[in-house]
Amino acid sequence: MNEFEDIIYPGPSHVTTNIEFEDENIENNENYLNLVQILKELVDNNLKEEIEFKPMVGGVTNTLFKSSFITGQGSNKSVIIRLYGKGSEQFIDRKTEANIQYLLSKNGVGPKFYGTFENGCIYGYVEGDQLQLEDLYQNNILSLIAKETGRWHSLKLDINSNSQLLLSSSSDSSIKESTTISTSTSTSTSTSSTSPSTSPSLENSTLSPRNMNTQTSSTSLFKNLNSWINNAMTLTSKESKGSMISKINLNRYKEEAMSLMSFIEEHYSGEEYINFCHNDLIPRNMIYNKEKGQVKFIDFEYSGYNFRGYDIGNFFCEFSGLDLDYTKYPSIEIQKRFIKNYLISINNCKNIQQKQKQKQQQQQIQNSINDENMDIENDELLYEPSKEEIHNLYIESNHLTLGSHLMWGFWGIIQHFSSSIDFDYIDYAIKRFKQYDLVKNKVLSLK
């Protein structure tokens, strides 16, 4: 059993209506009736029109509302309405995002996805509490986040078609071959990986990003860096010399990004390093259900195949919050505790998949992976990651934090020109670039 609603539709629907809100007081907005009609078409045609809209705070890409109403059957229901941020199409392929949301919901990994309208989408409300920064330091919650991250990284998803979600242990070889990127849930360290005794540097990376293999070039990190750098350079090309942006040497950070991608290609190009990732594991994208003892992820707009070290390293960066207080960056002890529980989760999912594969029962594989009663504590009795395994992934994740700093730095530059959300994107970008400079040598010298 899983907490999300059963999917009862063949695929996501689309309504050709555009919603424009100048403020968060939807009830007084002239588009209110349009939004009611969208809810009727996508969610419940017989819903009662006494609808409550509650703004969800904290978003820096989109505007979110929780909509509560009474269904035609007389029951209470809540959904999330997301209005796409102005200019966010520069970062996000909305068609791919809708397909990912549909496939994740169909497999029980995400909430029910009802469909899209011209500048937004609607999906189910996940019961629980949105995590706050301070929650990340609680051992039980950190373990649950690690468990859910491991479960995500065990999935195989064809994000370029409307095919069903595929588990990495599928016994059908033809199904395996249909996926866009082949991944592995192996927790062993590749012989080509960076050894803890090695101190790599970007200067030693000689591969050209243009010649990178298809698997690494298709990762979210590489695609985003290549695209966002070009967008940022174009947008800033006409800035006056006295502006704040003109003081950022984007050409240098572009070169840093090229060198970093070559470095990652050299050390982390094996398929064991690439999984289906959330890519935006910030506290407000995690819902904690205390009663069920679960943490579930929401908001999948940046999700896609990526380096596992990026997903983990980016999560560590998010301990610093939107104000980027890096004194809150997790200690080595906290990082390794998270990594240990992550490896346990990955191994547990892999073992379940292998056992069910032997029985040739694909449905049982899916149900087992989605079993909400699978707990970290019991898994520890079955598998104990080695210190070397934990340490190697610790180094890998910290190497990939460099990609996080650069990627979100360029994101901030673009958002400055396009977003209507009240947030200091330039200050955010400057701080991410500065942190890259500050930690680069230290991170690359990890042994």
Swiss-Prot record:
CDD domains: ETNK_euk. Belongs to the choline/ethanolamine kinase family. Its EC number is 2.7.1.82. This is Probable ethanolamine kinase B. Residues 178-217 are annotated as: Disordered. Residues 178-208 have a biased composition (Low complexity). GO terms for cellular component: cytoplasm. Pathway: Phospholipid metabolism; phosphatidylethanolamine biosynthesis; phosphatidylethanolamine from ethanolamine: step 1/3. Its main location: cytoplasm.
